UniProtKB/Swiss-Prot annotation:
Chief location: membrane
Protein's cellular compartments: Cell membrane
GO cellular component entries: plasma membrane
Native organism taxonomy: Bacteria, Bacillati, Actinomycetota, Actinomycetes, Mycobacteriales
Protein name (Swiss-Prot/TrEMBL): UPF0353 protein MAP_1207
Location of the VWFA domain: 98-294
Taxonomic superkingdom: Bacteria
Membrane topology: Multi-pass membrane protein
Entry keywords, A to Z: Cell membrane, Membrane, Transmembrane, Transmembrane helix
Cross-referenced Pfam families: VWA_2
TM region positions: 18-38, 67-87, 309-329
Stored CDD domains: vWFA (cd00198)
Family the entry assigns: Belongs to the UPF0353 family.
SMART domains found in the cross-reference section: VWA
């Protein structure tokens, strides 16, 4: 958590937990203070004229004189927590990630169950996704139907992706596995170029489709969607699938109405096999919401960040209060 004027604070993920041994010293100082106060009280009782003491001393000695010592001990505890190195989760923008947007352009995307049609809605939402994605991410675009084509190799140039989205054209059949394999090849190619570390850049495939794979008909075929999803998992590339449309979609083919219901189950299985997440959207607004969620997941990574600053500032504040109360109450620092 982060508090106003103090900064990040956490009570977990300590990097130097052995510093908590210093609390034994703090406890020893507190015990020493208590013993000194008891000894002081005994000395006063031993040498004082009891009749005179009772007449001039208050019946109940003020406990406020102990406040500076209490605050001093509290500040030492706070400084100890800070020295132990607490951490918290910090989200930072990714700069080396690769995202491949794989879009189904089969004839079923003509369906008008989502206005004006599935393709037009997909284009609008995908362009918004490209605009809002973290600038340092390399975004690529693949269109697939019976075959898959790399329209834009992974790049930080968002205009190239948006221009290509405007030029998507319908085609026959649906080869989902081909689209995934093509995306994996594009990721491997750009990963070799980007480099920049011992590991390849993190990558993600965002697969957008509305229907069942028709080529091949068996998704477990060597070129099928399920086989491609397993390959993606082996390569450490999760697939986020978006099934778009309603169960009531249809297209006109040779003056015949052909039902094209959305196929949620196949895409859900693809996401599961690859280690990714599955989403579904039945409207443009829902689709934009899904893309916004993906943007947050893909555009940032979570790392451990320092959370000791707040404890240091709070400790300094309490220490200052200890000094101030010592001057006001006892006219000197506690001994």
């Amino acid at each position: 958590m982060s508090l106003p004027f103090l900064g990040p604070m956490s009570l977990s993920g300590f990097e130097h937990s052995w510093f908590f041994l210093f609390l034994l010293v703090v406890a020893g100082l507190a015990a020493l203070y208590i013993l000194m106060q008891l000894a002081r009280q005994r000395r006063m009782l031993r040498f004082a004229n009891m009749e005179l003491l009772e007449s001039v001393a208050p019946k109940r000695p003020s406990t406020w004189r102990h406040l500076p010592a209490i605050l001093l001990v509290a500040s030492l505890v706070l400084f100890t927590i800070a020295m132990a190195g607490p951490t918290n989760d910090v989200r930072i923008p990714r700069n080396r990630a690769v995202v491949m947007l794989v879009i189904d352009v089969s004839q079923s995307m003509r369906a008008t169950d989502v206005a004006p049609n599935r393709m037009a809605a997909a284009q609008e939402a995908a362009k918004q996704f490209a605009d809002e994605l973290t600038p340092g991410i390399n975004l690529g675009l693949i269109a697939y139907a019976g075959t898959a084509t790399v329209l834009v190799s992974p790049t930080t140039n968002r205009e190239a992706t948006k221009n290509a989205l405007d030029k998507l054209q319908f085609a026959d059949r649906t080869a989902t596995g081909e689209g995934i394999f093509t995306a994996l090849q594009a990721i491997a190619t750009v990963g070799a170029v980007i480099g920049g570390g011992d590991k390849p850049p993190p990558a993600r495939i965002v697969l957008f489709s509305d229907g069942k794979e028709t080529m091949p008909t068996n998704p477990d075929n060597p070129k099928g969607a399920f086989t491609a999803a397993r390959t993606a998992k082996d390569q450490g590339v999760p697939i986020s699938t978006i099934s778009f449309g309603t169960p009531y979609g249809f297209v006109e083919i040779n003056d015949q109405r052909q039902p094209v219901p959305v196929d949620d189950e196949t895409l859900k299985k693809v996401a599961q096999l690859s280690g990714g997440n599955a989403y579904n959207a039945a409207s443009l607004q829902e689709l934009k919401s899904v893309y916004a969620t993906l943007q947050q997941q893909i555009g940032y990574e979570t790392i451990k960040g320092d959370a000791s600053v707040g404890w240091v500032r709070l400790g300094a504040l309490v220490l200052a209060l200890a000094a101030l109360t010592a001057l006001l109450i006892n006219r000197r620092l506690p001994t």
